[in-house]
UniProtKB/Swiss-Prot annotation:
The record marks W41 as: Seems to be involved in pH gating. The gene is M. It is a single-pass type III membrane protein. Residues 60-83 are annotated as: Disordered. This is Matrix protein 2. Pfam families: Flu_M2. A lipid is attached at C50 (S-palmitoyl cysteine). It comes from Influenza A virus (strain A/Chicken/Hong Kong/YU22/2002 H5N1 genotype Z). Belongs to the influenza viruses matrix protein M2 family. Keywords: Disulfide bond, Host cell membrane, Host membrane, Host-virus interaction, Hydrogen ion transport, Inhibition of host autophagy by virus, Ion channel, Ion transport, Lipoprotein, Membrane, Palmitate, Phosphoprotein, Signal-anchor, Transmembrane, Transmembrane helix, Transport, Viral ion channel, Virion. GO terms for cellular component: host cell plasma membrane; membrane; virion membrane. Residues 1-22 are virion surface. Homotetramer; composed of two disulfide-linked dimers held together by non-covalent interactions. May interact with matrix protein 1.
Amino acid sequence: MSLLTEVETPTRNEWECRCSDSSDPLVVAASIIGILHLILWILDRLFFKCIYRRLKYGLKRGPSTEGVPESMREEYRQEQQSAVDVDDGHFVNIELE
């Protein structure tokens, strides 16, 4: 054996042992975090419109009508419907504050 082979072999084996040691808690934790990050990123890209719309507007469907007379509720519904039905060929986006 040459001197070069004898010096090279233990170094290479040492690196292989360090990298393939999956029982190290730090390696296991890093793997789990990496997999979770990948899954969350994929879900975010697939459902980003739904997720961010929920964060922006919350779970509310519209303004509360509690304590408002029925006649005013009906008038409000008609105004909203007429605003949406302005042009049948185009969608009108209405944001209420």
